[in-house]
């Protein structure tokens, strides 16, 4: 089963869930997860929890314990917050390149599904009649301790956007599209290194070429350990073909290490 994860603590999450039920045929069942009704359509469930999702390590085990099934993939429908309050629709995988400040464990990465994130990016961009920013975010926050692939798809970046009806519609349609298509869609995959939190060069590459990104390690986490790039490759559900570096957006020792590692592993090295 595929799982769409929502939480009652998050206005954007509830907005997206409402649109999924209204527009995409999800029906309430007699089952409960964390005390909340489970909604179902075909091979997909909508689950709701009562706390912040970024702290829900071992969610896959909780689903197995409560519902008797192991999810194939988990899509977290979430808000995005920023001080700049820029209207945005974003996607990313979770994990921590260093200390775990907001969920997950130190230097631990969730399992990325690059094709799903790229499909989300493309679909959000296609549907974006709001003229909001569409982008990847760098790998950050929890949960990191999941044994199945996952991704966050988010509405940002203030309450005005979180409750925006059209944004909820776009993300509901995006999520259903991604879950329907991701297994049959394959792209060349890269680990992304460098740039800012909103990964502008990686986003541009993904929107304009066939490249899909897995984990993205922004400049603010550099210098980056070689072991963490290896972990990012390991924690990717699809074959990794390349290491991509935003050259000017990376610290010297990290970009040189990444270039050497690509050569060592026989991966394509891509730089912008």
Swiss-Prot record:
Q: Does the keyword Zinc apply?
A: yes
For whether the record's keyword set contains Metal-binding, the answer is yes
Coiled coil residues, start to end: none
Its Enzyme Commission number(s) read: 3.1.1.96
GO biological process, any: D-amino acid catabolic process
Q: Which GO terms describe its molecular function?
A: D-aminoacyl-tRNA deacylase activity; zinc ion binding
The protein's annotated catalytic reaction(s) are: a D-aminoacyl-tRNA + H2O = a tRNA + a D-alpha-amino acid + H(+); glycyl-tRNA(Ala) + H2O = tRNA(Ala) + glycine + H(+)
Cystine connections:
none
What cofactor does this one take? Zn(2+)
UniProt remark on cofactor binding: Binds 2 Zn(2+) ions per subunit.
Sorted keywords for this record are: Hydrolase, Metal-binding, Zinc
Query: Which family is this protein grouped under?
Result: Belongs to the DtdA deacylase family.
This protein's assembly is summarised as:
Monomer.
| Described function | D-aminoacyl-tRNA deacylase with broad substrate specificity. By recycling D-aminoacyl-tRNA to D-amino acids and free tRNA molecules, this enzyme counteracts the toxicity associated with the formation of D-aminoacyl-tRNA entities in vivo.
In Swiss-Prot or TrEMBL terms, this protein is called: D-aminoacyl-tRNA deacylase
Q: Which organism is it from?
A: Thermococcus onnurineus (strain NA1)
């Amino acid at each position: 089963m595929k799982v769409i994860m929502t939480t009652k603590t998050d206005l954007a999450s509830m907005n997206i869930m409402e649109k999924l039920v209204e527009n995409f045929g999800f029906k309430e069942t007699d089952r409960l997860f964390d005390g909340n009704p489970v909604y179902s359509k075909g091979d997909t469930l909508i689950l709701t929890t009562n706390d912040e999702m970024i702290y829900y390590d071992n969610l896959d085990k909780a689903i197995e314990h409560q519902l008797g099934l192991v999810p194939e993939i988990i899509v977290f429908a979430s808000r995005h917050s920023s001080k700049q309050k820029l209207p945005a629709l974003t996607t990313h995988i979770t994990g921590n390149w260093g200390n775990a400040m907001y969920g997950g464990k130190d230097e631990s990465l969730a399992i990325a599904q690059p094709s799903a994130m790229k499909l989300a990016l493309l679909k959000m961009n296609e549907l974006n009649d709001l003229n909001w920013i569409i982008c990847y975010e760098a790998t950050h926050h929890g949960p990191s301790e999941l044994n199945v692939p996952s991704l966050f798809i988010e509405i940002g970046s203030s309450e005005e956007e979180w409750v925006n009806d059209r944004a909820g519609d776009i993300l509901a349609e995006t999520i259903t599209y991604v879950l329907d298509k991701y297994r049959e869609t394959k792209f060349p995959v890269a680990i992304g290194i460098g740039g800012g939190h909103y990964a502008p060069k990686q986003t541009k590459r993904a929107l304009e070429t066939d490249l899909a990104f897995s984990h993205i390690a922004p400049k603010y986490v550099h210098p980056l350990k070689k072991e963490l790039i290896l972990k990012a490759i390991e924690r990717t559900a699809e074959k990794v073909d390349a290491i991509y570096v935003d050259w000017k957006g990376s610290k010297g020792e990290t970009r040189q290490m990444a270039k050497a590692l690509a050569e060592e592993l026989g991966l394509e090295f891509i730089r912008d």
